[in-house]
Structures are given as structure tokens and as C-alpha cells.
């Protein structure tokens, strides 16, 4: 999930050993390891080998490039470096804001200087640094606090802080979990009866926009409820376009660009309001209610891992496995014997009912195509399922896989089908060629 952890401490404080002992190597980017990838140890004037610093420009450029790739996917990531200067930590702020991460600094400064000096001398020859460097970094770390936009923790606090725990939601009379809306406001308003109850919680599983024909009304509704404490918006794969729209960024979606965006433009929304709305989307809802534990994501997952923080946000949004995966039965099989219930949207290729498997509820009901808005409610009496028929949608030509008697498929028809397809985007090449 979207969590960045920066280790901070002078050489010899045990940062790399701590990573190894906590089995966190697979989540870690190490500046020293990248230095050794660029160049093997070099002989210094004392006749010993050490790690060259001459490639640091390339090293940090590569590290930030790899980090941004991870952050695009919402991966939990640790950076193993000294981070002695406050300015070094500040260098991550732009990415933290761009990808909506939480940033933590694990502070190793409680390790006594004498201990760090001793450990430094005991390290492999090429990993040792001069005592003067250890002294200077130690003093700088003590005199320059980490920036206020980070949360500072001690190494011994890590296991407790970095554990995504369920919250208790028993204070609510009822919990409504509402499936993919896809720009269909009328059917949503029909279910809500025009209002939200203050003592009830409303969780939206994502994909609020696209495909439907009432996108502007949906956005207006979201703007009206986004600050309510009893509303949780989950991020779906289509909802990233809302963030891009608010920041005037390029959106690589023909459906959004040709259908949704014109609706939003005509409505004249303030882009600042759109940006604030985009920041309200959550990655996951994990809670207990009564005797049961619930995990709600947009895409659906295969099991509840030991620590949800280690899951990439991209998997929470797009789901584990492919679109064709029957994730409901996969989850039920993997979670046999555990009192955990999954609720998700996004995919339902097999047209499963809302209660798709013993431990999994599927809220994808093709609402945008005249199907149903799917809802699950949870209260003291248990779980109830609902399907509300959507009668406000755009009728489109039959899919190309259908058989049309006396109808010939033309090039124009095929190209139009590709242009309107949700999962096909055009890439323009030189010479007027499109791919």
C-alpha cells in the first residue's frame, strides 16, 4: 500500500542488518547496492577497498526512477540510506504528494556513537567509512530534525506501526456497501432515496464514473458528500481519471476523453474541488462489525495477507489475477476456516449473484448497460443484498460477437467499435498510422 519508509542513521547503526532481520529486503531500495551495481569497489589511498561515490548522480537518478515505478503501483517501499541531511528527505516530498503516500522516517539516532564507530570498523572492508564521516553524520542527524510532513518512529516501534489493523464500526446502525456506479446517478439516488442517514455508514466500492450518461450528476453528488464522516469512497480503476482531470493531466482513456470529460466540462466544475474530491478516495476498508471481519476493495483479492501494507495498491484496485478470474470462489477457498468476508466490485465475467461465494460478495452488476446497481447492507440482523434496475443508460450497438442476420460487418462499424471500447486506446504513429 502507499507507504514510504526512509531509514535514517549514520553508518554502523545497523540499518541494513535491521532490514535483513525483519525480512524486508524485497521491499527495499538501497543506495549502496545501486552504487555496487554501477561500479565494483575501488582501491583507496590507504590501500583498502571502498564503495565509490563518483557515480552518485546516476545512482540517485536510478533510485528515484525505480522508486517512482513502485509508487505508481502503490507499493510499500523502504529506502536504505543515511538520510543525514534534512534536504535529502525533502527530496521525496514531490513524489509523496503526487502518489498520495504516507511517509515515515525510522530513526536510528538512539544508537550510541561509540557503538556505531565500533560496528563500522567491524564491517566488510569495502563497506567501512572514515570515523570522521560517522562523527559528522551523527552530529547532523541530531541537529537537523526530519521534516514535519513525515512521521518519525524508532526501530522498535516499526512492527506495531506498520501493521494495517481492522477498525471497529459497531457504532453505526447500518453499513451500506454500494457497488460500481459508472456514471449512473438516477439509480443511485433511487436507492438512497435522496438522503444519507447520519447514524449509518456509506461505503462506495469505486468506479464512480465512465460509461454511464449521468457523470456530472454523480460528481456533483460526490462533492456534496465528500466531507461527511460517514462516507468512505474507495478508489476504482476509473477513478484515477478524476484526479488527472483535476490536475489537467493527459488521460489515456478514450471513454473518459470522449464521453465523461465533455460532461464534466459542460457542468463547469471548479478544478480545485475536483482535486479535493480525488484526495478523498481510499485504498481499502478493513473493519469488524459484530462478530465478523470484512475486507472491502474495488478489484477483489485472493486472501487476507498477514500484513495488508505489503500489498500493492494496484492489486487492491485492479484485483488479484485477471479480469476473468473467479475471485469470489478463490477467496472463499483460500479463507476456509477463517471468519472473514470479502466485498468487491470491478469484475463479474461469470455473472455471479451478489452473494457470489460463501465468503465473498460481488457488486459488479453492469449498471451502466441497463443492469443493476448492487448493494450489500450490514446491520445487527446480518447481511442483506439488493439489486436496483437501472433504466437510465445509453443503448449501444450489439457487441461484435453477436450474430446479426443479413448484416455485414463494415470497416467503419469495426473502427467505431474500437473507438468506443473501454479497454482499447489509440496510439498515433508517424505517417497517419494508428495502432
Annotate each PLM feature.
Residues 99-116:
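Conserved phosphate-donor/acceptor-positioning beta-strand/loop module used by diverse small-molecule
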Residues 329-432:
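Acidic, His/Gly-rich catalytic cores of divalent-metal-dependent hydrolytic chemistry
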Residues 155-221:
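N-terminal active-site segment of His-dependent metallophosphoesterases
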Residues 4, 111-163:
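Conserved GTP-binding G-domain of TRAFAC-class P-loop NTPases and closely related GTPase folds
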Residues 3-21:
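Glycine-rich phosphate-binding P-loop
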Amino acid at each position: 500500500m502507499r507507504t514510504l519508509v526512509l531509514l535514517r542513521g549514520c553508518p554502523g547503526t545497523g540499518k541494513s542488518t535491521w532490514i535483513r532481520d525483519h525480512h524486508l529486503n524485497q521491499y527495499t531500495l538501497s543506495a549502496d547496492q545501486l552504487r555496487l551495481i554501477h561500479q565494483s569497489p575501488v582501491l583507496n589511498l590507504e590501500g583498502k577497498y571502498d564503495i565509490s561515490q563518483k557515480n552518485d548522480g546516476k545512482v540517485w537518478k536510478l533510485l528515484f526512477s525505480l522508486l517512482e515505478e513502485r509508487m505508481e503501483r502503490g507499493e510499500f517501499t523502504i529506502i536504505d540510506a543515511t538520510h543525514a541531511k534534512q534536504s535529502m528527505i525533502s527530496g521525496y516530498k514531490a513524489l509523496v504528494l503526487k502518489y498520495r503516500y504516507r511517509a515515515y522516517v525510522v530513526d536510528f539516532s538512539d544508537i550510541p556513537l561509540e557503538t556505531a564507530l565500533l560496528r563500522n570498523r567491524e564491517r566488510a572492508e569495502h563497506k567501512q567509512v572514515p570515523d570522521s564521516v560517522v562523527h559528522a553524520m551523527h552530529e547532523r542527524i541530531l541537529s537537523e530534525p526530519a521534516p514535519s510532513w513525515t512521521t518519525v518512529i524508532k526501530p522498535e516501534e516499526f512492527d506495531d506501526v506498520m501493521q494495517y489493523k481492522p477498525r471497529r464500526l459497531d457504532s453505526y446502525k447500518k453499513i451500506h456497501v454500494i457497488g460500481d456506479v459508472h456514471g449512473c446517478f438516477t439509480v443511485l439516488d433511487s436507492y438512497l432515496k435522496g438522503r444519507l442517514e447520519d447514524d449509518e455508514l456509506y461505503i462506495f466500492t469505486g468506479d464512480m464514473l465512465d460509461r454511464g450518461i449521468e457523470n456530472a450528476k454523480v460528481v456533483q453528488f460526490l462533492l456534496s458528500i465528500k466531507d461527511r464522516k460517514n462516507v468512505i469512497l474507495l478508489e476504482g480503476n476509473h477513478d484515477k481519471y478524476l484526479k488527472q482531470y483535476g490536475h489537467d493531466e493527459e488521460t489515456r482513456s478514450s471513454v473518459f476523453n470522449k464521453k465523461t470529460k465533455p460532461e464534466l466540462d459542460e457542468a463547469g466544475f471548479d478544478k480545485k474541488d475536483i482535486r479535493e474530491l480525488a484526495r478523498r478516495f481510499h485504498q481499502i476498508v478493513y473493519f469488524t462489525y459484530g462478530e465478523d471481519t470484512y475486507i472491502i476493495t474495488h478489484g477483489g483479492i485472493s486472501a487476507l495477507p498477514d500484513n495488508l501494507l505489503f500489498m500493492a495498491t494496484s492489486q487492491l484496485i485492479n484485483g488479484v489475477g485477471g479480469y476473468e478470474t473467479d475471485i469470489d470462489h478463490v477467496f472463499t477457498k483460500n479463507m476456509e476456516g477463517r471468519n472473514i468476508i470479502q466485498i468487491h466490485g470491478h469484475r463479474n465475467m461469470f455473472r455471479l449473484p451478489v452473494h457470489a461465494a460463501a465468503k465473498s460478495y460481488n457488486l459488479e452488476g453492469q449498471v451502466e448497460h441497463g443492469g443493476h446497481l448492487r448493494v450489500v447492507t450490514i446491520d445487527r440482523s446480518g447481511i442483506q443484498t439488493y439489486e436496483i434496475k437501472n433504466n437510465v443508460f445509453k443503448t449501444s450497438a450489439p457487441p461484435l460477437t453477436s450474430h446479426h442476420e443479413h448484416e455485414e460487418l463494415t470497416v467503419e462499424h469495426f473502427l467505431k467499435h474500437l473507438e468506443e471500447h473501454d479497454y482499447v486506446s489509440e496510439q498515433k504513429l508517424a505517417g497517419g498510422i494508428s495502432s
